[in-house]
């Protein structure tokens, strides 16, 4: 508090004390006649004026110090809020950077997986094309051999019909050995499925590969069944021709005797 304010405050206190002393001073006695004539008035309670507490002389209120402390407190709170804000922002930036890193890593992993699938699919297609070409070459070669055998059988049908029957019997025996060979090949082709270590994408890829393999096997089975039907039909035709030719040969070899021997 400044000196001027302190002086004004002391003057106000002095005036208030004088007013209280005037109110408390005893009134002069009035004449008896006047008091009798006047009617008594109800007494009103005297309310003492509000007097601010006196501040001791040795202590003074330093408003500048209070204002300074309040400013320091507000500044400290503001600095705390700023620090919290920047810490939160730093944390969010770190999380954003980590998220970007995860996205980039996953994108790279997906690209690598896609590249691996593409390369594997390319190898599979090349293998299928090579296998198809090899089968076509084998079928063409086998078809040429079958045609040569058919021509040879037809040319030697009359003289070697018995040998053909023997070959047919041998083919029947070979069918039994072919069954054993088929079982052996199936046992060799049948491989265990090790799918315990595979993930979801690998299982999906394995299922797709098995589905395509089954489709290919069904197609090969259909082709082989059609080929077997054709071969059976050709064998039946040749067998009928041989049987027909054999009947004519047997009829030509027998002689009919006419008349009676005496």
Swiss-Prot record:
Organism listed in the record: Mus musculus (Mouse)
Role noted for this protein: Troponin T is the tropomyosin-binding subunit of troponin, the thin filament regulatory complex which confers calcium-sensitivity to striated muscle actomyosin ATPase activity.
Domain of life: Eukaryota
Region (Disordered): 1-62, 109-153
Biased segments, Pro residues type: 43-55
Pfam family, one: Troponin
Family to which this protein belongs: Belongs to the troponin T family.
Compositionally skewed regions (Basic and acidic residues) per UniProt: 32-41, 109-149
GO cellular component: troponin complex
Molecular function per GO: tropomyosin binding; troponin T binding
This protein's name: Troponin T, slow skeletal muscle
């Amino acid at each position: 508090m400044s000196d001027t304010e302190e002086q004004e405050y002391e003057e106000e206190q002095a005036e208030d004390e004088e007013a209280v002393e005037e109110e408390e001073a005893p009134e002069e006695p009035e004449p008896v006649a006047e008091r009798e004539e006047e009617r008594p008035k109800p007494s009103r309670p005297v309310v003492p004026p509000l007097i601010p507490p006196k501040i001791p002389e040795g202590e003074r209120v330093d408003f500048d110090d209070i204002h300074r402390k309040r400013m320091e407190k507000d500044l400290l709170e503001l600095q705390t809020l700023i620090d919290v804000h920047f810490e939160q922002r730093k944390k969010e930036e770190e999380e954003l950077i980590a998220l970007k890193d995860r996205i980039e890593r996953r994108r790279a992993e997906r690209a690598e997986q896609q590249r691996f699938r593409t390369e594997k699919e390319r190898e599979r297609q090349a293998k299928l094309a090579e296998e198809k070409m090899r089968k076509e070459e084998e079928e063409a070669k086998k078809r040429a051999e079958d045609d040569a055998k058919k021509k040879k059988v037809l040319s030697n049908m009359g003289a070697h019909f018995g040998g053909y029957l023997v070959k047919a019997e041998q083919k029947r025996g070979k069918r039994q050995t072919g069954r054993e060979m088929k079982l052996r090949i199936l046992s060799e082709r049948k491989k265990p499925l090790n799918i315990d270590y595979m993930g979801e994408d690998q299982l999906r890829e394995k299922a797709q590969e098995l589905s395509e393999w089954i489709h290919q096997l069904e197609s090969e089975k259909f082709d082989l069944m059609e080929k077997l039907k054709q071969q059976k039909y050709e064998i039946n035709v040749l067998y009928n021709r041989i049987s027909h030719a054999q009947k004519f040969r047997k009829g030509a070899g027998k002689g009919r005797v006419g008349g009676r021997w005496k």
